[in-house]
């Protein structure tokens, strides 16, 4: 078993193992020396030869000091007692002096903190609540308090009037997950390692604001508006309650952008949680995603802000303001508003057409990185403050910790804003860092890094940029070439910041090594185009400047939007134009492949995903898409290889083992299906309803009905409306001979999912077997209504009409349709025999004989082929 270490212990060992001996480390942590040795092995912390030599020197010096101290103690024991008594008397005098006058001699920052805490009186800092709003995709210059006159945001404006508003707050990334990771760890993406949405995780060794507050006695909760911040990505660390609960089944397509909930659905569970917890001190985070596309605010905001697309964007922000007002009113009703810190901050903005970018994520201009930041503290002296100094969103966490009188961890890279809040303007010019790796990860173009202060903005790109943001706030005129000295200063500062802020020992996400045999097999199936990731090869080379590719980027986005709107022909035409201009854009290949999937052109889709992997063999999204396409095409060996590769690449993704379990279940290899489904559940228990349901189906095949029922009920606990669960419970009832209960379960499935054609079919067969032949007809009709190519459904409906001796001409048409759809399936002989019987009844003997012979011949053929 591994050594169990707390985060603080791990951090202490990492920071001190080179400078301190095992004895010193053990003494500090209060553990045995052997425990330290095992812990260092577990954390893979190894001292160099230099470290060991230095530790030996320290131990020698300490040994000499001990000997000298003993000699001195023997010689000067009386004198020592006399001196000690004087020291104690002086110390007591100093304590008395400090009690009355000490705050005037503290370091400046400590003075500010002490003054702030005095202003908060009679409230104690350690008893304040924190209500933390993150407003997704919200520009600072689209709020009333920031000078925008085309919108009404009275609640946010009032918070600014009663609090502190920062005019130059910069986000560290124009993407939701990296930005929120920075907000809640107080560190740069360079350090916490979350560089893009999806496929990145906030690692457990990173300390979050919620974790610190929970350790200090706060009840913690979070209420999330979009799947991009689902708990699976790691931001739930430290939260007692993390409300994500996204029902993925109700979305036609699942993407990080499309799975979202309206803000009213976010604050409703917050109100329920607060009703039970408002008498405790609490930290609650509310994430409002409404300002993100699509811009579709509810009434009256849709009508009030109907002036084009950007007007509807404002309408979404106005609606968010309304929701914030509802939350604040709830605090007042509970009489806790006066002891609650309110934070308003956006993760990033929205370009709205500036620099030819409509959304966000691609560029790092102020349109997407300059965000609102408002902090309202329960102090009248701090109302209405406006701070124009450059700050960063990573500064919020250390600021709150200082306000709450909690020590700030050493690895926090943000700076507390308490000094600025208390009026200190003597600090040196501050700089803010932003980055976007999105162009490189998705398109193979250059990443972007920027550095900003209150006067200039520098963007590191293949064609570097410098802007005078006072004279040119919309960054329209690049002054880089005419201001080389300023540009060089920013370049050096950016380089220094990136080197200093990067986490040591953490490499950027890259390919996982495979053995030679596995590599060759995967290459043969199209999963690997070469032995090195092209994204790795390109690092450091001159990649395309995103500025020069914005038109192609916009065409790709337009194709994605058309595809989402089921305008497949238009989407295909658009994305084909992009590929003709630049065949190496892996994301374009992905988009075209997904369009082919929707058109059921599986071979074309497979070819596209292979092309994407030729560009970047380690592009996980393309590997998944290729495996999924193989699965849809029933090329199961190829699909299995892909999903196994994905399990090696990302052991925390539950989708690959789920798909492997599904495939093996389809192949009736139940013993292989079960462990993969169990693995999927283990990885992501909160979203494991489908895996539990499939596991139930697997146990039905194994005749383990008790375990099957348990798994299906687990699925229903997680998702009460999950498809196929009641269908599977009906199968269990049938296996037990409980046919009446089986009918009830089938009917429940149909009530929840009227288009469930297999359930209609099974219920029809059950009615038939119970002698209720009339009842089977409507369900067989529903089965072929919802599944137009369901050959077996046509044949059994024809047989039902034959058995009832009615609609015989229609029965002929049904049988012929079933045979056309599947001329040589195991049920096809039945179709010919049905036709033979009908023709006999109609007196058409020759046709009857012909169909009978066809049925017998086909039956023999199928029998031989199965031997």
Across the structure, where does each feature detected by a protein language model lie?
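Catalytic domains that recognize anionic headgroups
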Residues: 82, 88-594, 598-602, 607, ...
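Start-of-helix register in tetratricopeptide repeats
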Residues: 553, 587, 621, 655, ...
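Short Lys/Arg-enriched helix C-cap and helix-to-coil transition segments
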Residues: 2-3, 45-67, 93-94
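Register position in tetratricopeptide repeats
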Residues: 564, 598, 632-633, 666-667, ...
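Canonical positions in the second alpha-helix
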Residues: 578, 611-612, 645-646, 679-680, ...
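TPR-repeat structural position
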Residues: 568, 602, 636, 670, ...
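Structural marker of alpha-solenoid helical repeat scaffolds
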Residues: 581, 615, 649, 683-684, ...
């Amino acid at each position: 078993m591994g050594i169990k270490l707390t985060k603080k212990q791990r951090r202490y060992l990492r920071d001190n193992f080179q400078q301190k001996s095992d004895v010193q480390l053990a003494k500090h942590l209060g553990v045995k020396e052997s425990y330290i040795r095992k812990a260092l092995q577990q954390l893979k912390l190894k001292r160099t030869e230099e470290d060991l030599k230095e530790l030996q020197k320290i131990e020698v010096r300490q040994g000499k000091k001990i000997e000298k101290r003993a000699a001195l103690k023997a010689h000067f024991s009386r004198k020592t007692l006399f001196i000690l008594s004087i020291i104690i008397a002086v110390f007591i005098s100093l304590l008395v002096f400090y009690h009355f006058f000490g705050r005037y001699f503290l370091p400046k920052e400590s003075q500010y903190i002490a003054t702030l805490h005095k202003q908060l009186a009679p409230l104690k800092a350690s008893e304040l609540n924190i209500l933390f709003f993150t407003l997704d995709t919200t520009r600072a210059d689209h709020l009333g308090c920031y000078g925008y006159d085309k919108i009404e945001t009275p609640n946010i404006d009032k918070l600014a009037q009663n609090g502190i508003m920062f005019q130059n707050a910069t986000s560290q990334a124009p993407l939701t997950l990296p930005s929120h990771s920075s907000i809640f760890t107080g560190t740069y993406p360079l350090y916490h390692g979350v560089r893009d949405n999806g496929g990145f995780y906030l690692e457990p060794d990173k300390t979050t604001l919620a974790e610190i507050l929970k350790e200090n006695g706060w009840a913690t909760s979070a209420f999330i508006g979009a799947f991009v911040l689902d708990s699976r990505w790691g931001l739930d660390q430290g939260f007692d309650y993390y409300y994500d609960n996204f029902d993925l089944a109700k979305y036609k397509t699942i993407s990080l952008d499309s799975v979202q909930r309206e803000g009213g659905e976010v604050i409703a569970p917050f109100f329920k949680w607060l009703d039970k917890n408002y008498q405790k001190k609490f930290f609650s985070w509310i994430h409002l995603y409404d300002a993100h596309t699509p811009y579709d605010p509810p009434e009256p905001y849709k009508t009030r802000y109907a002036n084009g697309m950007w007007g509807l964007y404002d309408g979404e922000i106005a609606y968010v303001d309304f929701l914030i007002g509802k939350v604040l009113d709830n605090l007042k009703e509970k009489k806790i508003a006066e002891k609650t810190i309110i934070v308003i901050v956006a993760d990033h903005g929205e370009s709205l057409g500036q620099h030819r970018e409509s959304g966000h994520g691609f560029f790092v201009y102020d349109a997407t990185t300059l965000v609102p930041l408002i902090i309202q503290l329960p102090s009248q002296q701090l109302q209405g403050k406006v701070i124009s100094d450059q700050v960063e969103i990573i500064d919020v966490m250390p600021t709150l910790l200082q306000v709450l009188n909690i020590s700030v961890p050493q690895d926090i890279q943000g700076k507390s804003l308490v000094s600025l809040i208390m009026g200190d303007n003597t600090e040196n010019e501050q700089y803010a860092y932003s980055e976007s790796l999105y162009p490189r990860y998705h398109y193979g173009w250059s990443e972007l890094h920027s550095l900003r202060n209150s006067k200039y903005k520098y963007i590191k790109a293949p064609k570097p940029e410098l802007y005078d943001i006072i004279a040119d706030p919309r960054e329209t005129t690049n002054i880089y070439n005419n201001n080389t000295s300023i540009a060089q200063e920013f370049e050096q500062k950016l380089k220094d910041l990136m080197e200093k802020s990067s986490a040591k020992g953490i490499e950027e996400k890259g390919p996982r090594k495979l053995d030679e045999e596995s590599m060759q097999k995967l290459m043969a199936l199209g999963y690997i185009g070469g032995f090195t990731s092209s994204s790795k090869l390109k690092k450091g080379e001159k990649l395309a400047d995103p500025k020069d590719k914005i038109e192609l980027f916009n065409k790709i986005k337009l194709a994605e939007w058309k595809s989402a709107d089921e305008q497949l022909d238009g989407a295909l035409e658009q994305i084909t134009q992009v590929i003709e201009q630049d065949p190496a854009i892996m994301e374009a290949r992905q988009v075209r492949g997904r369009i082919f999937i929707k058109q059921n052109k599986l071979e074309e889709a497979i070819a596209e995903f292979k092309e994407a992997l030729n560009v970047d063999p380690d592009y996980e999204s393309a590997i998944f898409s290729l495996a999924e396409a193989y699965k849809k095409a029933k090329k199961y060996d190829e699909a299995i290889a892909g999903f196994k590769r994905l399990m090696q690449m990302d052991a925390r993704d539950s989708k690959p083992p789920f798909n492997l379990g599904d495939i093996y279940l389809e192949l009736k290899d139940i013993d292989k299906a079960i462990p993969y489904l169990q693995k999927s559940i283990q990885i992501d228990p909160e979203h494991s309803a489908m895996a539990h349901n499939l596991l139930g189906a697997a146990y039905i095949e194994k005749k383990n009905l008790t375990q099957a029922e348990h798994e299906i009920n687990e699925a229903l606990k997680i998702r009460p409306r999950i498809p196929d669960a009641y269908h599977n419970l009906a199968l269990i009832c049938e296996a037990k001979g409980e046919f009446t209960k089986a009918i009830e379960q089938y009917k429940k499935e149909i009530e929840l999912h009227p288009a469930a054609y297999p359930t209609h079919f099974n219920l029809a067969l059950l009615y038939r077997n119970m002698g209720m032949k009339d009842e089977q007809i409507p369900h067989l009709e529903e089965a072929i209504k919802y599944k137009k190519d369901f050959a077996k459904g046509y044949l059994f409906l024809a047989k039902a009409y034959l058995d009832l001796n009615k609609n015989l001409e229609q029965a002929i048409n049904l049988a012929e349709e079933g045979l056309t759809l599947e001329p040589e399936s195991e049920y096809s002989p039945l179709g010919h025999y049905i036709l033979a019987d009908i023709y006999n009844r109609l007196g058409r003997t020759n046709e009857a004989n012909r169909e009978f012979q066809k049925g017998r011949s086909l039956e023999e053929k199928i029998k031989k082929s199965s031997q």
